[in-house]
Each structure stands twice: as structure tokens, then as C-alpha cells.
């Protein structure tokens, strides 16, 4: 078999890939079989260090023949024609998650809405208040005293908005911090009033 168009896959040097998605094992001296994953993407399975490792073809191709810096990179590989089975090099584009999300949203006939994140100025969906990167993360620094203050003086809903957790998440956080039933705070309210 001629291997003139094949290139080494950097993360798996015992395997080679052609621009057409053929994967060759130098261990077994044969081409690997493509399989179809549950998401509809073709993949191959390598045997490395006693384990099976499955990797989708479009990421392997982008890694070796395009500008995907590594297989673990957070960059995504887009199929221009949206056909998951078309992994020809001219159909693959490496892009950021945000760019991929916007492209897919527009291709599906939805509008982005022209809204921008107030923190970083990235374009966001019309129903979003911030982009995913700027969305407030739950703070492990929330104390039981803070929760009690907001709930006693206002409500669970107001407390959850102020502290950046869902109402239910805040109740679970209170229980994990104190071991008490979150309803016990309401009992304090009735005792105070």
C-alpha cells in the first residue's frame, strides 16, 4: 500500500491519516475501519496504552491538515455544508465555540438579535443577558449568614438573584452549609415579625 499522502497524527505517532480520512495503523499495517457515532459523526478507534480511544475523523483531519493546534483544543471543527459525513478538507473549518454557535444559529434560521454582552461586547442571542463566558458562576464563598440575611429580609427569589444561584441551588447550598432544613429560615421570619 502506498502511503505517500499520509501524515503522522502527532498525538498518536503509530497512526497515519490521509487527506481523505483514511487512517492507517503502522502496528497492524492496515487501514482502520470507520464507525458511525451516536451523534452521527464518523470516528476511528485507536488502541493506545491498553485502552481503546475513539476520535472523530473531522478532528483528526483538522489536527493534521488544518490549523487545529491539538486534539484536546477547545476550538471546534465546523462542516461548512452541515453534512456530518462530508469530512473532505475543503468542507472543514476550525473556529471558536462562539463563532461556531453564531454560524449554526444563523444557518438554522434564527436571528442573533444584535445584542451584545454588556461585559465583553461579544454578540449574544436575543434571549440572553450575557455571553456564556461572562455568565455569573456560582460562588463557593456564599455563607449561611448571607443566605439567612437575604431570605429573612426579602425572599428566596430575591436572595437567589442577589447571590447568583438558582432558588433551588441556594436552598441546597444552605442545607449543605448548615445541615438544617431551608424552611427553618422562614420560621425565623415568623418569630422576628
Swiss-Prot record:
Induction: Expressed in the early phase of the viral replicative cycle. The keyword Chaperone does not apply. It holds the Pfam family HNH_3. Its EC number is 3.1.21.-. It is an enzyme of class 3 (hydrolase). InterPro entries: His-Me_finger_sf (IPR044925), HNH_nuc (IPR003615), NUMOD4 (IPR010902). GO terms for molecular function: DNA binding; endonuclease activity. Keywords: DNA-binding, Early protein, Endonuclease, Hydrolase, Nuclease. Endonuclease that cleaves only one strand of asymmetric DNA substrates thereby introducing interruptions into the template or coding strand. This is H-N-H endonuclease F-TflII.
Amino acid at each position: 500500500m502506498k502511503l505517500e499522502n499520509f501524515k503522522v497524527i502527532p498525538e498518536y505517532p503509530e497512526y497515519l491519516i490521509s487527506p481523505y480520512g483514511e487512517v492507517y495503523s503502522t502496528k497492524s499495517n492496515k487501514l482502520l475501519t470507520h464507525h458511525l457515532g451516536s451523534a452521527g459523526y464518523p470516528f476511528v478507534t485507536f488502541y493506545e496504552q491498553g485502552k481503546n480511544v475513539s476520535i472523530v475523523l473531522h478532528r483528526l483531519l483538522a489536527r493534521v491538515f488544518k490549523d487545529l493546534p491539538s486534539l484536546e483544543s477547545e476550538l471546534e471543527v465546523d462542516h461548512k455544508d452541515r453534512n456530518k459525513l462530508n469530512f473532505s478538507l475543503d468542507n472543514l473549518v476550525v473556529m471558536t465555540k462562539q463563532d461556531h454557535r453564531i454560524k449554526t444559529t444563523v444557518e438554522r434560521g434564527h436571528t442573533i438579535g444584535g445584542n451584545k454582552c454588556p461585559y465583553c461586547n461579544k454578540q449574544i442571542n436575543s434571549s440572553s443577558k450575557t455571553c456564556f463566558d461572562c455568565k455569573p458562576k456560582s460562588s463557593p464563598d456564599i455563607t449561611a449568614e448571607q443566605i439567612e440575611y437575604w431570605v429573612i429580609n426579602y425572599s428566596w427569589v430575591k436572595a437567589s438573584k442577589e447571590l447568583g444561584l438558582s432558588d433551588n441551588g441556594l436552598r441546597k447550598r444552605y442545607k449543605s452549609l448548615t445541615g438544617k432544613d431551608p424552611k427553618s429560615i422562614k420560621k425565623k421570619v415568623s418569630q422576628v415579625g
